[in-house]
Amino acid sequence: MGYIGAHGVAALKKHKYSGVDHSYLAKYVLQPFWNRFVKIFPLWMPPNMITLMGFMFLLTSALLGYIYSPKLDSPPPRWVHFAHGLLLFLYQTFDAVDGKQARRTNSSSPLGELFDHGCDALGCALETMAYGSTAMCGRDTFWFWVISAVPFFGATWEHYFTNTLTLPVVNGPTEGLALIYCGHFFTAIVGAEWWAQPFGKSIPLFSWVPFLNEMQMSRIILFSMIFFAVIPTLAINTSNVYKVVHSRNGSMLLALAMLYPLVTLIAGVLIWDYLSPIDLIRNYPHLVVLGTGLAFGFLVGRMILAHLCDEPKGLKTNMCMSLLYLPFALANALTARLNDGVPLVDEFWVLLGYCIFTLSLYAHFATSVIHEITTALGIYCFRITRKEA
């Protein structure tokens, strides 16, 4: 069974991307650089290839983090931090110029939008792993993934209802990534231990502040992001969706229902970690973030496809396919509570199965949708020339 019906094909042919970026950093600093940088690519270079190259930078960064900090709680060599920063900067640059290349070559398409944002969704997990090694976050790495994934999903959800992707004056793809790669470069100078020690020791000027002075520096960053970035962003997303739904006499309950799969996914993984006898997130942070990141990529991709195909607003039931593995994982972890701490199946293999399941789900979705869109529009994914009629 395909993902796109006859109505979806007709909507794809009419779709036009709409996006607004209010960032001053992008407007006055990065955009002029990107406008020059895109010219290094030949006109035969397909935009999706540039997107894929940018994605590979993040994949390389995540692999470096795994090699030199398997549990994300030990300091890697300082050159690794510099590599993380450089690779993230290159990812941001390639992610910004793929759309410019599409306009240069007159090859813009709904597939490009889906491919771009789909890679960005997976990139949340990959960059979280890289940052986890830089800041020695350990099990907190999962929470850093949450605070990157939730605003991303909120922006995608808002885009689905408003038909315009609006980036505020301070936003994640611009200022957020810039802060992160500057953090990587900074860590290459001071060392990863700077993030793992108490706030008062890392910044002696504020050692007099009660409670905070004993908190780990990386957790200060985590809580600051939650209160000053994630919560305000979600409030704006929800407000904008409410305005659109109210103006169309729609149901806000149906709109909020689209958030159910992500909330359930995060809650399910946290409950699994709580029940597990081996402390999943601490011992296997890469696998937990990778498996959950792939499930998240499927959720984002499915919502973007619903937007491109002008599907009715509301929960897409097949989004819940990303949750199918969790009942088995939870049941297996629960058997350990009933069997003296020994689960029915070793938790490592259950976690590995989770990653294989979500990878298979995402791969099937991605390959199927790419095939259906290229067939419907008569285009190629990695070639600029159109298919012969």
UniProtKB/Swiss-Prot annotation:
Q: Which gene encodes it?
A: AAPT2
User: Which organism encodes this protein?
Assistant: Arabidopsis thaliana
Q: Which cysteines in this chain are paired by disulphide bridges?
A: none
What's its membrane topology? Multi-pass membrane protein
List the coiled-coil residues: none
The protein's predominant localisation is membrane
GO MF terms held by the record: diacylglycerol cholinephosphotransferase activity; ethanolaminephosphotransferase activity; metal ion binding
UniProt record similarity statement: Belongs to the CDP-alcohol phosphatidyltransferase class-I family.
Give the stretches traversing the membrane.
49-69, 141-161, 176-196, 220-240, 252-272, 286-306, 321-338, 350-370
Q: Is Plastid tagged as a keyword?
A: no
> Any one Gene Ontology biological process term?
phosphatidylethanolamine biosynthetic process
Give the EC number(s) listed in the UniProt record: 2.7.8.1, 2.7.8.2
List the protein's name: Choline/ethanolaminephosphotransferase 2
Q: Which cofactor does it need?
A: Mg(2+); Mn(2+)
Localization of this protein: Membrane
Which pathway is this protein engaged in?
Phospholipid metabolism; phosphatidylethanolamine biosynthesis; phosphatidylethanolamine from ethanolamine: step 3/3; Phospholipid metabolism; phosphatidylcholine biosynthesis; phosphatidylcholine from phosphocholine: step 2/2
What are the GO cellular component annotations? membrane
Q: Which domain of life is it from?
A: Eukaryota
Q: Which UniProt keywords apply?
A: Lipid biosynthesis, Lipid metabolism, Magnesium, Manganese, Membrane, Metal-binding, Phospholipid biosynthesis, Phospholipid metabolism, Transferase, Transmembrane, Transmembrane helix
Give the enzyme class: transferase
